[in-house]
Amino acid sequence: MDMIARLGQLPRLALTAAVLLGSAIPVPAQDQPAASLYAAAQAERGQAAYRQSCQDCHGSSLDNGEFGGPPLKGGYFRTRWGQGSVAALYGYVSLAMPPDRPGQLSPQTYADLVAFLLSNNGYPPGDKELPPDQNAQQNMSLKR
């Protein structure tokens, strides 16, 4: 094969090499749920606590409260919390909610409530419960 013929094959070889190299580079998945952050039983306890302490303001479906609380699922939740940490969400809920008695529920109840919110926003349950300790939650991301 002469030199001119070999040069003519360079674009094809470059394209083949680019395709092969590109397929070996891992690409982060889009819209994949975060690692499991809570247990299903915890979310069930959180649902009971939600009915008792949160439902009047945020509604039975987390987005239709009688007293105008913001939606706790869907786009609003993703915008407000979806790029942060579980610790930030837990910290806010445990310090500011419910408005008539902020911080008055037990740490475990607040963790259960956060688990319930996560379950309603597409985060999958796992085997371990969300710890009721903000320091233990620092590296738990809500990013997907």
Enumerate the predicted regions with their spans.
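The canonical Cys-X-X-Cys-His
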Residues: 46, 50-61, 113, 117
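Electrostatic cytochrome c docking/interface patches
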Residues: 27-49
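Gly/Gly-Pro-rich "capping" loops immediately C-terminal to redox-active cysteine motifs
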Residues: 40, 61-92
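N-terminal secretory signal peptides that target proteins for export/translocation
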Residues: 1-9
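Bacterial N-terminal signal peptides
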Residues: 12-23
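Flexible coil segments in periplasmic/lumen-exposed cytochrome c-class electron-transfer proteins
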Residues: 33, 102-144
